[in-house]
């Protein structure tokens, strides 16, 4: 009989970049004669809704279905899974501090690579150790500095929320940037 024990799962951590990510599922090396099978993905917090392209931040459960008959195994139409068949797509934004020479012109304290943050996220910044947060948008840019002294005295934190379409309470807060 076909069971989850005959399959091997590889790949448990991915970094969000807007692209689809999925682990590798194969039959174990010493297992022969299994027919073709279909891999399905589900968000851990909603096991009813199949995800066609796992690319959003979150934890996913992997299930195998529609195993075709092979030389040594019968067909199987139910779902097969294992407690270890999980993988995560983690939010890991690329945030860099200004590194060029100061020339008296204003330069943003940091830059954020947009492709590393999910669309529709709320991005905020704080320059007072997280006491006050300001939403970052086209009307409110990242604070700028013009001199080395200003740069040394400006500390900024970034907070990203609402990045997971299935949950409104996810929040990621950065380390301090200076």
Language model regions located:
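Solvent-exposed beta-strand/loop surfaces, strongest in extracytoplasmic domains of secreted
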Residues: 1-178
């Amino acid at each position: 009989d076909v069971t989850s024990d005959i399959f091997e799962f590889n790949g448990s951590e991915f970094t969000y970049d807007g692209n689809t990510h999925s682990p590798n599922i194969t039959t174990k090396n010493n297992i022969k004669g299994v027919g073709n099978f279909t891999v399905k993905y589900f968000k851990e917090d909603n096991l009813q809704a199949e995800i066609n392209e796992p690319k959003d931040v979150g934890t996913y459960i992997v299930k195998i279905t529609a195993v075709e008959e092979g030389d040594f195994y019968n067909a199987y139409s139910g779902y097969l899974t294992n407690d270890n068949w999980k993988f995560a797509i983690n939010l890991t934004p690329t945030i860099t501090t200004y590194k060029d020479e100061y020339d008296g012109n204003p330069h943003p304290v940091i830059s954020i690579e947009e492709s590393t943050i999910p669309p529709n996220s709320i991005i905020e910044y704080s320059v007072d150790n997280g006491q006050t947060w300001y939403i970052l948008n086209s009307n409110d840019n990242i604070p700028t500095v013009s001199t080395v002294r200003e740069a040394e005295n400006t500390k900024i934190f970034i907070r990203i929320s609402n990045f997971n379409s299935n949950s409104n309470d996810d929040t990621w807060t950065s380390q301090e940037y200076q």
